[in-house]
């Protein structure tokens, strides 16, 4: 019930040039230092050191040559101005350099910005291992059409889950299929396989969707109340689930524990296509 280690998440992001989120469980300053120390163990001297920046002063996307990645701290205690979030999201969309977002807790964030990041990892640092996987060989991994259908089934059922926010499609956005496919191929390659299995899809699902899911916060967002569900019972269910999730998030050091529960409940109901 824990997130993948920071070392594994960062390694995937650097190799495949994707933005990732790191929950460090510490202050942003300490988190930046810990990840910088982790990246210092890379054995390739040709790879330049990461560069730190803030969302208030983002570097020009036209001058990103010679940079391995950006380390960006993000406050999760208060919602950042909408315009600033939107500007940050547009910058991420244009950036050809992977960004590592350093967080202490699950932040208040607009969906468009959240979806610019591939997946979340942490709080365990793990051990750095230099990758033998290159971006150029990812497409060599075979994916059977039944695997693609399995991923689509999971996406549909996550969107339709009772606790998923209908207005946001539950957070399973339009790039979910391509993002999941890439993550499945990465898992296959790092496992020494040339094809994707249903187990790999489930592993990818647990890594990818918790960061993206958008869940309802009250009965006012639950469409079932229009068909007879009692608002007070829906609110009680949500409140009890929130209380349980907060307790377990601390135990497993996983700020996305509640979202992971939703993902796992959906996976139990979906049988891989044959």
UniProtKB/Swiss-Prot annotation:
Taxonomy, superkingdom: Eukaryota
Protein's job: May be involved in telomere capping.
Family of the protein in this entry: Belongs to the MTC2 family.
Protein name: Maintenance of telomere capping protein 2
Species of provenance: Kluyveromyces lactis (strain ATCC 8585 / CBS 2359 / DSM 70799 / NBRC 1267 / NRRL Y-1140 / WM37)
Lineage: Eukaryota, Fungi, Dikarya, Ascomycota, Saccharomycotina
